[in-house]
Amino acid sequence: MPATAVKKPSFHYGWVIVFAGMLCILACLGFGRFALGMLLPSMAATLHLSYSQMGFISTANFLGYLASVLVSAHWAGRIGSRRLIFLALLTVAVSMALVSRATGFLSVLLLYMITGIGSGATNVPVMGLVAAWFSSGRRGRAAGFIVIGSGFAIMIAGRLIPYLNRWIGPEGWRASWLILSGLVMLIAIAAVAMLRDGPGEKGLAPVGAGETAPPVDPGPGQAGMNIYRKGIIYYLGAIYFLFGYTYVIYATFVVTTLVRERGFSESLAGNFWMWVGFLSLFSGPVFGTLSDRIGRKAGLMIVFSLQAVSYLLIATKLPGMFLYLSIVFYGIVAWSIPSIMAAAIGDYVGPKKSAAAIGFVTFIFGLGQISGPAIAGVLAERTGSFSGSFYMAAAFAGAAIALSGFLRKPQTA
């Protein structure tokens, strides 16, 4: 595009895309997934759910998520990311509203699987927009700000859900699902108003496009490449699998562990979960930006190291101070891996193939999310404690550190 045809405004619309993307992640992952950890104890009491059933409910959500990420890039290409995101968020909102009326394990299982379908069909195109709207040197920061939406959602859920449970009683979780559903619906409307599929729609170049001379272009060879034949995509997928397997065990069961095994009240456990949300607000921007500076490999190794320590601290049942440290270490890196991974994929395959590559790697990530809570729930059922599950998560995080250490530098941006 000729230089005269590209606007360079003082405030780039790409940051509006980041804000809209953050709202989308808040809705589809924050409310659609991470609120579950706060809701499970009261749902389990009312619906008489076992540990293994709690794990399978989380797994069902990830099965839906997994199915949708396989086709999300295809549908984003056909109808556009903006429209797909809107329809997917509507799916999340409606399914969450229906969960509020569930009467047993099977109904929750099926409806929450549909929520997962909507979550995946939102997340993949949202993260794919990062490569379209931002140059390589800005992608980590942009993705980092987008993923903090989950942190805001955790803070809201950590305060709202215990309050409703105290006010309404044992059935308070139903009101929580309904209110969260309404918020997702409002975000869907806001997102469709703000999102655009690419900077060309606004007559703009990507953010930071003029900061390198010349900007790196994937070229015709990369533009026509088959991402499924690139070994690096599978390698990134393996690392992302380990993240999916481990982080979701903590996110799903830490509140249940605090309430059932440590004797915490639901309100106090909610305060702990709210602190995770607050600390996580810094995770994406800080570590995404850090990975722009020190490289994706070093960024991944630092994050997985802190996560491994977090899992070990809660597994060992040490005194309260160590529990606080576990919460801190988990929170400060909570959403770092998705932001680094989205940026890394853009680095390796370029903006044109980014959405498809993110979709495929997220599919592998989803396999980890499916396996983690199911195995952790069954293990806890057999041992009577989640300690073994958290030890397992720490071991898998250690494997992720090792894999990240052998990650090679990308050839394209």
Question: Positions of the model-derived regions?
Answer:
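C-terminal ends and interior cores of transmembrane alpha-helices
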Residues: L90-T103, L306-L318
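Cytoplasmic helix-loop-helix junction between adjacent transmembrane helices
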Residues: M113-I148
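Paired small-residue
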Residues: S95, L106-I114, M321-F329
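Helix-breaking motifs and short loop linkers at transmembrane-helix boundaries and internal kinks
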Residues: H48, G80, R101-L106, G263, ...
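Core transmembrane helices of Major Facilitator Superfamily
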Residues: L29, I114-V126, Y330-M341
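Extracytoplasmic gate region of multi-pass secondary transporters
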Residues: L36-L40, R229-F282
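C-terminal transmembrane helical hairpin of 12-TM major facilitator-type secondary transporters
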Residues: M274-S283, T289-A344
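Helix-loop-helix hairpin linking two adjacent transmembrane segments in secondary transporters
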Residues: F145-G200
